[in-house]
Amino acid sequence: MSIDKARAHLKKHGLEDRIMELTVSSATVALAAEALGCEPARIAKTLSFEHGDGAILVLAAGDARIDNPKFKAQFGVKARMLAADRVEPLIGHAIGGVCPFGVNPGIPVYLDESLRAFDVVYPAAGNSASGVRLTVEELERASEAAGWVDVCK
């Protein structure tokens, strides 16, 4: 199960106790915010994009939107979300639970500047009924991010 992969990954960083398993869906920003009792912007949504033959992940604030010119300037390609049937095989997590923890090898993770507006954010934890309460600094460390980018508006 993907939540087990996320838990094992977070354990390496001493953060596995932060996972919240929910009894309701957290598959969208709105559902996650309601389930976790926070404002939607604090949901650290994980977006999966095509990049060459593989994929990249970008975590952004729940209310942020991809800015196509910024994305192309940063990554050298047009922003194209992964097709639904490619997400789990490429990333290692199913849609609704995609997170930066325990992803398949070779998938770079980037954090968008929109997250810096918050002290605490809530990414998913590998399935569509989970979340993790992390400071932005903990998220940066635990996601093993390749870096910070500015690709949202």
Describe the role of every protein-language-model region.
Residues 1-153:
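Extended, low-hydrophobicity, polar/charged segments
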